[in-house]
């Protein structure tokens, strides 16, 4: 059945004609104008700044706390030919952050090395053993962290004790106690007053680069765009400026590694946007850090050797494929371990790759709609990630170590605490009366009419991009349309393309992961969709297509699966009239009881969200009918000629002569017997020639047969709506 994944909330409209006129000057249609107005943009100045952001809108990097100290120390290191280590992170934000600073320092003539920690051997953030190696073996005298550092107390204290200064540049959550670093550059530093708090790690690195070079180094913005999009920070203020310029730069990038990676990924650079980066580029970079040594990414992003770039890009793409396989394997295994009796899941196993557990937890959350904790067991510890529904803040649990935000967490705990963790979470949910089954909200920005939808509508909304956190891609509400066709597509027919029409207007809706619902989308009445707008380019033609976000059905869902071509859905229970279900929202009406009227009481007492009508009939009387007046007359006339007739041995001959099916003939003879037209003794039938004249309709057997035939005809040949109305007593 079609079940919505979200709780839909349609925004109310507004009627500010003045703002609509202002928006029109910027090339926006009224629908786009309404969306911006509801997102807090009301003046012409705000509107112009949003639609046409400028590099002049970037804030002064020296407003960041300790920026002056960081610049002074790095410049001194360059002047004194000190060895500088850039210490990054193993994700796309960390990779781009390190690459930005590497190119900046090399441009300034610095002696610089870059190291990205290995997730499995070094862990996240400053690692004392790594610091020790670079200090003792490589002669490093200045360490600059990017996208990490504010939690690296021990490693930074060690470096400072060894006479090596550490400049921290980071954007992660500040702790109460900060490390004793030479400088800490952070947009949320408690002693700072930076006007925008939501920079990614690469954004902070870029601000440092601008301060060092004393100019806005726009050539680095392609890397800033990748890291900012990948880290899913707020797409507002200067992040919006940097990403918009960076995406333009990416479309014409001269970076050999990015060119090769995009070529291998099949990315059309002309149509590249924030979704291309978020769903195709960033996952490939992240896959490297999730599974292996992330350091080759630095050469990919900054190198000039085309052949080496090609080889690294191939390797990264293969890691991404491997990542998908690992995720699928863990996901499949985790599903076999689910505890259906709990309002949450805590799943742990040896051998699971901790680098992908967040992805697995997210997939399980999407399917189960309840908090999920997925952990890998190694050396007596369980380490992994959690994903949670809106109703439950996972931080309320007790962890040895944790990180993340409300709804997502990373943690490490002793394996003997696993059951305690699960019980703690269960108790928290029960004690706080939390509804874990409640769906997350989906804001629908506007109801659209298919007949008013054009490519110009899409172009208007493209001006609002790049989309992301705090500037989400608009989601539109569609209803009152017809489904013209549905077809599966993709590997294993995993996806759908649904053609919807209204009047002369028609558009394709692409529904990823809905291939198993082809029948439902083709038959559902009252179908309503939540979609985003997208462009489809094929064979030189450009058209508007819709991308499905969610779907629901207004009213009960009735599906016709009669006939051999429609299998019974594996995940929907079959109705057993003798053991009726009480809690299911969907049911399959498979084999019908002989007395179909017995179903009416059941369906009038129970409400279902979806009913699948298979309607298999064990004894299909409807195929033969209930006997016509001529058939009864011909039967009587035939048997009247005989003194007696042995029905045990001559029934088939009689049926053949009368051209009546055996099963119907038996019923007709039973009707004659009931009306006393004949008697039957030991299988021998004799005509009662003194019987009173009576109507066939006086027979109870005839009435029951007629009713059965009519009911079976409805169940076999009627529409599902007619069947439903009859079962529910609506007619």
Give residue spans per PLM region.
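Extreme N-terminal flexible tails
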Residues: 1-26, 30, 702, 708-711, ...
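Hydrophobic helix-and-loop "lid/oligomerization" segment in the mid-to-C-terminal part
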Residues: 2-4, 11-142, 162, 180, ...
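Acidic beta-strand-to-loop metal/phosphate-binding motif
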Residues: 87, 141-148, 585-592
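Short, ordered loop/turn segments at secondary-structure junctions
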Residues: 89-90, 117-120, 148-149, 171-174, ...
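Short Gly/Thr/Asp-enriched flexible loops that form oxyanion-binding sites at enzyme active sites
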Residues: 97-101, 153-162, 171-172, 358-361, ...
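Acidic, two-metal ion nucleic-acid-processing modules in DNA metabolism proteins
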Residues: 106, 240-331, 386-400, 406-731
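Active-site cavity-forming subdomains of large catalytic enzyme subunits
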Residues: 132-202, 206-211, 219, 236
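Short alpha-helices
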Residues: 180-230, 594-597, 601-605, 609-616, ...
